Regions:
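Sec-dependent N-terminal signal peptides
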Residues: 4-13
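Vicinal oxygen chelate
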Residues: 18-26, 28-39, 65-68, 80-165, 170-171, 193-196, ...
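Short, charged/polar, Gly/Pro-enriched secondary-structure boundary elements
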Residues: 72-76, 83-85, 132-135, 212-216, ...
Length: 309
Protein backbone atom coordinates (compact mmCIF):
# COMPACT_ATOMS: atom_id res chain seq x y z
CA UNK A 1 0.00 0.00 0.00
CA UNK A 2 2.83 2.37 0.87
CA UNK A 3 4.45 1.64 -2.50
CA UNK A 4 1.21 2.52 -4.33
CA UNK A 5 0.92 5.78 -2.43
CA UNK A 6 4.59 6.51 -3.09
CA UNK A 7 4.32 5.89 -6.84
CA UNK A 8 1.13 7.97 -7.02
CA UNK A 9 2.97 10.83 -5.34
CA UNK A 10 5.93 10.49 -7.70
CA UNK A 11 3.77 10.43 -10.83
CA UNK A 12 1.66 13.36 -9.63
CA UNK A 13 4.78 15.32 -8.76
CA UNK A 14 6.31 14.52 -12.15
CA UNK A 15 3.21 15.78 -13.96
CA UNK A 16 3.19 18.95 -11.89
CA UNK A 17 6.90 19.48 -12.52
CA UNK A 18 6.34 19.10 -16.27
CA UNK A 19 3.63 21.78 -16.19
CA UNK A 20 5.89 24.10 -14.23
CA UNK A 21 8.81 23.52 -16.61
CA UNK A 22 6.81 24.59 -19.68
CA UNK A 23 6.43 28.36 -19.55
CA UNK A 24 3.53 30.12 -21.24
CA UNK A 25 4.64 32.51 -23.99
CA UNK A 26 3.02 35.94 -24.08
CA UNK A 27 -0.55 36.33 -25.32
CA UNK A 28 -0.70 39.98 -26.31
CA UNK A 29 -4.16 40.67 -27.68
CA UNK A 30 -6.85 39.90 -30.24
CA UNK A 31 -5.51 39.18 -33.72
CA UNK A 32 -8.84 38.78 -35.49
CA UNK A 33 -12.42 37.56 -35.20
CA UNK A 34 -14.20 35.67 -37.97
CA UNK A 35 -17.95 35.50 -38.59
CA UNK A 36 -20.40 34.15 -41.16
CA UNK A 37 -22.54 36.36 -43.38
CA UNK A 38 -25.57 35.90 -45.61
CA UNK A 39 -25.21 39.27 -47.34
CA UNK A 40 -21.78 40.38 -48.57
CA UNK A 41 -23.04 43.62 -50.08
CA UNK A 42 -24.74 44.83 -46.91
CA UNK A 43 -21.71 43.74 -44.92
CA UNK A 44 -19.42 45.78 -47.14
CA UNK A 45 -21.67 48.80 -46.71
CA UNK A 46 -21.34 48.60 -42.92
CA UNK A 47 -17.62 48.00 -42.64
CA UNK A 48 -16.10 49.69 -45.69
CA UNK A 49 -18.50 52.60 -46.07
CA UNK A 50 -20.13 53.42 -42.72
CA UNK A 51 -17.19 52.45 -40.50
CA UNK A 52 -14.63 53.42 -43.14
CA UNK A 53 -12.45 50.36 -42.57
CA UNK A 54 -9.99 49.23 -45.26
CA UNK A 55 -11.01 46.17 -47.25
CA UNK A 56 -8.41 43.44 -47.64
CA UNK A 57 -7.84 40.22 -49.51
CA UNK A 58 -9.12 37.05 -47.78
CA UNK A 59 -6.57 35.06 -45.80
CA UNK A 60 -8.43 31.94 -44.69
CA UNK A 61 -10.02 29.09 -46.62
CA UNK A 62 -13.56 29.98 -47.64
CA UNK A 63 -13.25 33.57 -46.49
CA UNK A 64 -15.16 36.13 -48.56
CA UNK A 65 -14.38 39.43 -46.88
CA UNK A 66 -11.81 40.93 -44.57
CA UNK A 67 -11.73 44.39 -43.02
CA UNK A 68 -8.64 45.80 -41.35
CA UNK A 69 -8.71 47.60 -38.00
CA UNK A 70 -5.16 48.87 -37.50
CA UNK A 71 -3.09 45.69 -37.11
CA UNK A 72 -6.18 43.56 -36.45
CA UNK A 73 -9.03 42.46 -38.66
CA UNK A 74 -12.52 41.01 -38.84
CA UNK A 75 -13.36 38.42 -41.48
CA UNK A 76 -16.48 36.87 -42.97
CA UNK A 77 -17.23 33.59 -44.74
CA UNK A 78 -20.49 32.46 -46.34
CA UNK A 79 -23.01 31.20 -43.78
CA UNK A 80 -23.14 27.40 -44.29
CA UNK A 81 -26.61 27.15 -42.73
CA UNK A 82 -29.03 30.05 -43.03
CA UNK A 83 -31.12 28.61 -40.18
CA UNK A 84 -28.20 28.45 -37.72
CA UNK A 85 -28.48 30.92 -34.85
CA UNK A 86 -24.76 31.55 -34.36
CA UNK A 87 -22.77 33.58 -36.88
CA UNK A 88 -19.45 33.58 -34.99
CA UNK A 89 -16.83 31.25 -36.48
CA UNK A 90 -13.75 31.77 -34.32
CA UNK A 91 -11.74 34.19 -32.19
CA UNK A 92 -7.98 34.50 -32.65
CA UNK A 93 -5.43 35.79 -30.14
CA UNK A 94 -1.87 36.90 -30.87
CA UNK A 95 1.07 35.13 -29.25
CA UNK A 96 4.81 35.64 -29.45
CA UNK A 97 5.51 31.92 -29.92
CA UNK A 98 2.92 29.61 -31.42
CA UNK A 99 4.92 26.41 -31.00
CA UNK A 100 5.74 27.10 -27.35
CA UNK A 101 2.10 27.89 -26.59
CA UNK A 102 0.97 24.67 -28.24
CA UNK A 103 3.41 22.69 -26.07
CA UNK A 104 2.29 24.61 -22.99
CA UNK A 105 -1.39 23.85 -23.62
CA UNK A 106 -0.66 20.18 -24.24
CA UNK A 107 1.23 20.00 -20.93
CA UNK A 108 -1.90 21.35 -19.22
CA UNK A 109 -4.18 18.73 -20.72
CA UNK A 110 -5.61 20.73 -23.63
CA UNK A 111 -6.07 18.75 -26.85
CA UNK A 112 -3.91 20.33 -29.57
CA UNK A 113 -2.52 19.41 -32.96
CA UNK A 114 0.91 17.83 -33.23
CA UNK A 115 2.29 21.01 -34.79
CA UNK A 116 1.28 24.57 -35.60
CA UNK A 117 0.34 25.29 -39.20
CA UNK A 118 1.56 27.99 -41.54
CA UNK A 119 -0.70 30.47 -43.26
CA UNK A 120 -0.35 33.72 -45.16
CA UNK A 121 -0.32 35.65 -41.91
CA UNK A 122 2.13 33.50 -39.96
CA UNK A 123 2.01 30.42 -37.74
CA UNK A 124 -1.21 29.39 -36.05
CA UNK A 125 -3.20 26.57 -34.47
CA UNK A 126 -6.72 26.14 -33.16
CA UNK A 127 -8.26 24.56 -30.09
CA UNK A 128 -11.73 24.31 -28.64
CA UNK A 129 -12.42 25.91 -25.29
CA UNK A 130 -14.49 23.95 -22.71
CA UNK A 131 -17.75 25.08 -24.32
CA UNK A 132 -16.68 24.25 -27.86
CA UNK A 133 -15.83 27.76 -29.04
CA UNK A 134 -13.08 27.70 -31.68
CA UNK A 135 -10.06 29.63 -30.44
CA UNK A 136 -7.07 30.30 -32.67
CA UNK A 137 -3.61 31.43 -31.62
CA UNK A 138 -1.59 33.34 -34.20
CA UNK A 139 2.06 34.27 -34.33
CA UNK A 140 1.90 37.03 -36.96
CA UNK A 141 4.58 37.35 -39.60
CA UNK A 142 5.95 40.88 -39.69
CA UNK A 143 7.16 40.42 -43.24
CA UNK A 144 3.67 39.64 -44.51
CA UNK A 145 2.15 42.46 -42.49
CA UNK A 146 4.47 44.87 -44.28
CA UNK A 147 3.29 43.95 -47.82
CA UNK A 148 0.02 45.71 -48.64
CA UNK A 149 -0.33 44.56 -52.23
CA UNK A 150 -1.21 40.95 -52.95
CA UNK A 151 -0.57 39.67 -49.43
CA UNK A 152 -3.85 40.44 -47.76
CA UNK A 153 -3.31 43.94 -46.43
CA UNK A 154 -5.47 46.95 -47.21
CA UNK A 155 -6.66 47.23 -50.80
CA UNK A 156 -8.53 50.46 -50.33
CA UNK A 157 -9.10 52.72 -47.38
CA UNK A 158 -10.89 55.86 -46.28
CA UNK A 159 -8.65 58.50 -44.74
CA UNK A 160 -10.96 58.69 -41.73
CA UNK A 161 -11.84 55.22 -40.37
CA UNK A 162 -14.09 55.32 -37.32
CA UNK A 163 -11.67 53.10 -35.37
CA UNK A 164 -8.15 51.72 -35.57
CA UNK A 165 -8.37 49.28 -32.63
CA UNK A 166 -10.39 46.17 -31.90
CA UNK A 167 -10.45 46.24 -28.09
CA UNK A 168 -12.63 43.27 -27.19
CA UNK A 169 -14.83 40.46 -28.38
CA UNK A 170 -17.49 38.53 -26.52
CA UNK A 171 -19.57 35.39 -26.72
CA UNK A 172 -22.18 33.45 -24.76
CA UNK A 173 -20.80 31.50 -21.80
CA UNK A 174 -22.84 28.88 -19.93
CA UNK A 175 -20.32 27.55 -17.40
CA UNK A 176 -18.13 30.35 -16.12
CA UNK A 177 -16.09 28.06 -13.87
CA UNK A 178 -15.16 25.79 -16.78
CA UNK A 179 -14.25 28.74 -19.00
CA UNK A 180 -12.25 30.33 -16.17
CA UNK A 181 -10.20 27.16 -15.81
CA UNK A 182 -9.19 27.45 -19.47
CA UNK A 183 -8.80 31.21 -19.88
CA UNK A 184 -7.77 32.24 -16.38
CA UNK A 185 -6.03 29.24 -14.79
CA UNK A 186 -4.28 27.88 -17.88
CA UNK A 187 -3.89 30.84 -20.24
CA UNK A 188 -3.46 33.54 -17.60
CA UNK A 189 -6.32 35.84 -18.57
CA UNK A 190 -7.30 38.18 -15.72
CA UNK A 191 -10.52 39.89 -14.71
CA UNK A 192 -10.73 43.47 -16.02
CA UNK A 193 -14.29 44.32 -14.95
CA UNK A 194 -17.60 42.64 -14.25
CA UNK A 195 -21.15 43.90 -13.98
CA UNK A 196 -24.80 43.21 -14.63
CA UNK A 197 -28.18 44.65 -15.47
CA UNK A 198 -29.09 44.50 -11.78
CA UNK A 199 -27.02 45.28 -8.71
CA UNK A 200 -25.33 42.20 -7.32
CA UNK A 201 -25.73 40.22 -10.55
CA UNK A 202 -22.92 39.44 -12.99
CA UNK A 203 -24.07 39.31 -16.60
CA UNK A 204 -20.74 40.32 -18.14
CA UNK A 205 -17.21 39.38 -17.13
CA UNK A 206 -14.37 41.00 -19.06
CA UNK A 207 -11.31 38.73 -19.10
CA UNK A 208 -8.20 40.63 -20.18
CA UNK A 209 -5.38 38.91 -22.05
CA UNK A 210 -2.37 38.30 -19.78
CA UNK A 211 0.08 40.48 -21.70
CA UNK A 212 -2.05 43.28 -23.14
CA UNK A 213 -5.25 45.26 -22.72
CA UNK A 214 -7.68 43.51 -25.11
CA UNK A 215 -10.31 41.36 -23.46
CA UNK A 216 -12.77 38.54 -23.97
CA UNK A 217 -16.21 39.25 -22.55
CA UNK A 218 -18.22 36.39 -21.08
CA UNK A 219 -21.89 37.00 -21.90
CA UNK A 220 -23.66 35.25 -19.03
CA UNK A 221 -27.23 34.31 -18.05
CA UNK A 222 -28.54 33.92 -21.60
CA UNK A 223 -31.57 31.78 -22.49
CA UNK A 224 -30.79 28.18 -23.40
CA UNK A 225 -32.02 28.53 -26.99
CA UNK A 226 -31.44 32.12 -28.13
CA UNK A 227 -32.55 33.20 -31.59
CA UNK A 228 -30.24 34.68 -34.23
CA UNK A 229 -30.80 38.26 -33.09
CA UNK A 230 -30.05 37.52 -29.44
CA UNK A 231 -26.95 35.52 -30.32
CA UNK A 232 -25.83 38.33 -32.62
CA UNK A 233 -26.02 40.83 -29.78
CA UNK A 234 -24.03 38.55 -27.48
CA UNK A 235 -21.42 37.19 -29.91
CA UNK A 236 -19.91 40.52 -30.85
CA UNK A 237 -16.84 42.67 -31.39
CA UNK A 238 -16.00 46.10 -29.99
CA UNK A 239 -14.02 48.84 -31.70
CA UNK A 240 -12.26 51.41 -29.55
CA UNK A 241 -12.72 55.14 -30.15
CA UNK A 242 -11.28 58.20 -28.43
CA UNK A 243 -14.41 60.35 -28.64
CA UNK A 244 -17.88 58.93 -29.26
CA UNK A 245 -19.36 62.15 -30.63
CA UNK A 246 -16.55 62.32 -33.16
CA UNK A 247 -17.03 58.65 -34.09
CA UNK A 248 -20.78 59.05 -34.67
CA UNK A 249 -20.15 62.23 -36.68
CA UNK A 250 -17.77 60.26 -38.92
CA UNK A 251 -20.41 57.59 -39.51
CA UNK A 252 -22.97 60.25 -40.39
CA UNK A 253 -20.47 61.80 -42.81
CA UNK A 254 -20.11 58.33 -44.35
CA UNK A 255 -23.87 58.16 -44.96
CA UNK A 256 -25.13 56.47 -41.78
CA UNK A 257 -28.57 57.53 -40.54
CA UNK A 258 -30.34 56.48 -37.31
CA UNK A 259 -33.20 54.03 -37.81
CA UNK A 260 -35.13 55.02 -34.70
CA UNK A 261 -34.91 56.92 -31.41
CA UNK A 262 -32.83 54.12 -29.85
CA UNK A 263 -29.97 54.71 -32.28
CA UNK A 264 -27.86 56.87 -29.99
CA UNK A 265 -24.80 56.57 -27.81
CA UNK A 266 -25.12 55.96 -24.08
CA UNK A 267 -22.93 55.40 -21.06
CA UNK A 268 -22.73 51.71 -20.21
CA UNK A 269 -22.65 50.12 -16.79
CA UNK A 270 -18.85 50.25 -16.99
CA UNK A 271 -18.91 54.04 -17.22
CA UNK A 272 -17.81 54.16 -20.88
CA UNK A 273 -19.64 55.74 -23.80
CA UNK A 274 -20.95 53.02 -26.13
CA UNK A 275 -22.78 52.80 -29.44
CA UNK A 276 -24.01 49.78 -31.40
CA UNK A 277 -24.38 49.06 -35.10
CA UNK A 278 -25.26 45.68 -36.60
CA UNK A 279 -24.29 43.64 -39.62
CA UNK A 280 -27.06 42.12 -41.82
CA UNK A 281 -27.13 38.96 -39.67
CA UNK A 282 -27.61 40.93 -36.41
CA UNK A 283 -23.99 40.56 -35.27
CA UNK A 284 -23.29 43.55 -33.05
CA UNK A 285 -20.38 45.86 -33.75
CA UNK A 286 -19.98 47.93 -30.61
CA UNK A 287 -18.13 51.24 -30.52
CA UNK A 288 -16.65 51.98 -27.09
CA UNK A 289 -14.51 54.77 -25.72
CA UNK A 290 -11.14 53.57 -24.45
CA UNK A 291 -11.59 54.98 -20.96
CA UNK A 292 -14.58 55.56 -18.65
CA UNK A 293 -16.08 59.00 -18.11
CA UNK A 294 -17.71 58.04 -14.82
CA UNK A 295 -17.36 55.44 -12.09
CA UNK A 296 -18.63 52.00 -13.13
CA UNK A 297 -21.74 50.72 -11.40
CA UNK A 298 -20.82 47.27 -10.26
CA UNK A 299 -17.10 46.82 -9.71
CA UNK A 300 -13.87 48.74 -10.06
CA UNK A 301 -11.60 48.17 -13.03
CA UNK A 302 -8.81 45.75 -12.17
CA UNK A 303 -6.57 46.17 -15.22
CA UNK A 304 -5.17 48.85 -17.53
CA UNK A 305 -7.43 50.50 -20.09
CA UNK A 306 -6.80 50.07 -23.81
CA UNK A 307 -5.62 52.88 -26.08
CA UNK A 308 -5.49 53.55 -29.80
CA UNK A 309 -1.86 52.40 -30.06
Amino acid sequence: MKRIVCWTFILTSAGFAQQMAVQRPKITGIDHVDFYTSNEQANNHLYAEVLGLPSALPLETGQLQRFVIGKQWVGYSAAPDAKATNRMDHVAFSTEDCDALRVYLAAHGVKVRESAGRSKEGRSFRVNDPEGNVIEFVQPSGAIRAKPSGQGEALRARPDPVSRRLIHTGFIVRDRAAEDHFYKDILGFRLYWHGGMKDGQTDWAAMQVPDGTDWLEYMLNIDANPDLQTTGVMNHISLGVRDMKEAVAKMEAHGWKPHDKDDHSEIGKDGKWQFDVFDPDFTRVELMEFTPTQKPCCSDFQGPHPSEK
